[in-house]
C-alpha cells in the first residue's frame, strides 16, 4: 500500500511548525498516513522535535513542486495532502495533468481560495488556478470556506476541517470568573501581515469608539517588517493618544501571547477572507468576542457553534461589547467544533479520505 504524503508547499514557518508538531503529537502514532512530509523551508530543529515524522525539506517552492510532480508521475497511486498550498507550480501541474485529481487533496487555509491581489501576474494566474481547483480530488476547509468554494466549484467534494490551533482545553473556563469594566482594550489584527489592513482597521475602530479605548496591534510576525510597522504606528498616532496605542513589534512566545489576549475586551478583524483562526480561537476561549468583516465567511462557523458575532458594519459601543461578552460566557466551550481536541475527529476522517480508505 502507498502511504499518503503531506505537502507544505510554501515557506510559512509558524504555520508549518504548528502542523508538523500536531501530526507528530496527535496523529502519527495511530496512522501511517500521518508521517510522511515534504516541506518548503529550513529544518531549524523540526526533525528533532518531531521524531515520529519523516520530513524532507526543500529550499524553495519550485524544487519541492518538481519533486512532488516526479513522484506523482512515477506512481499514479501516490496520493498527496496539500496543506495551505500557495505554490503556483503545483496548481499548474494539476491543471496540465502532471498531478491527477485522484492524487490531489487540499486543505484550504484561506489565501489560495480568495483572489485579493491586484498585481498583473496574479490577475493572469487566478483564472488558471480557478480551472485547476475544479480538478481537486477533495477539499477540506471551514464551513464558510466550503460554502465559498462551492459557489464556483459545486462538483468538487468538500469536507469540514479546522486548522489545528494550539490550545489547552483546560483553559476553556478561564474567563468565566473575570469581571470586565473600565476602559476597553481592543486587539486589532492577528499578525503584522499586510492582509490585516491595519491602517483601515485602526480608522474603523476610531470611528466607532474614538480615543476612548486602548488599541493593541500585534506585529511581531512576519520578521523584517519594520517599515510597515512604522507606517502603522504613525497612522495610529494620528488617531489615538500615545497611551492608547500599543504596537507590538517583537514576536511573543505562546504563553505571553495568551496573557496579552486575556487583557483584551474585543478582537477586531477587518480582512474580507478567512484567516487568523488561531487568534480567533484563543480569543473566544478567553471569553472575548470578535468583530468580523461580513465578507469573512468564518462567521458561518461561529454562528453554527452558537457564538456571538459582531460585524464591522454594526454600530458598536461598550454596552454591545459587554452583552456579547455575557453571551460568550454562557457558551460551553468544550463543545465548540473548531477547538482542541474536538477538531481531531475531523483530521482522522480527512486522513482516511485522502489515503483512499474512507467513505
Swiss-Prot record:
Keywords, alphabetical: Cell inner membrane, Cell membrane, Glycosyltransferase, Membrane, Transferase
Pathway it acts in? Bacterial outer membrane biogenesis; enterobacterial common antigen biosynthesis
Q: Which Pfam families match?
A: Glyco_transf_56
- The top EC class, named as a word, is transferase
Keyword Glycosyltransferase in annotation? yes
> Which catalytic reaction applies to this protein?
beta-D-ManNAcA-(1->4)-alpha-D-GlcNAc-di-trans,octa-cis-undecaprenyl diphosphate + dTDP-4-acetamido-4,6-dideoxy-alpha-D-galactose = alpha-D-FucNAc4-(1->4)-beta-D-ManNAcA-(1->4)-D-GlcNAc-undecaprenyl diphosphate + dTDP + H(+)
Q: Does the keyword Isomerase apply?
A: no
GO BP annotation list: enterobacterial common antigen biosynthetic process; fucosylation
- The primary site where this protein sits is membrane
Fetch the InterPro entries from UniProt. Answer: WecF (IPR009993)
Localization recorded for this chain is: Cell inner membrane
GO MF terms here are: 4-acetamido-4,6-dideoxy-D-galactose transferase activity; fucosyltransferase activity
Q: What would be one Gene Ontology cellular-component term for the protein?
A: plasma membrane
Bilayer topology reads: Peripheral membrane protein
Annotated EC? 2.4.1.325
Database matches in NCBIfam families:
PRK02797.1-1 (NF002752), PRK02797.1-2 (NF002753), PRK02797.1-3 (NF002754)
Task: Provide the function of this protein.
Answer: Catalyzes the synthesis of Und-PP-GlcNAc-ManNAcA-Fuc4NAc (Lipid III), the third lipid-linked intermediate involved in ECA synthesis.
> Its family?
Belongs to the glycosyltransferase 56 family.
User: What name does the UniProt record give this protein?
Assistant: TDP-N-acetylfucosamine:lipid II N-acetylfucosaminyltransferase
> Organism, per UniProt?
Escherichia coli O8 (strain IAI1)
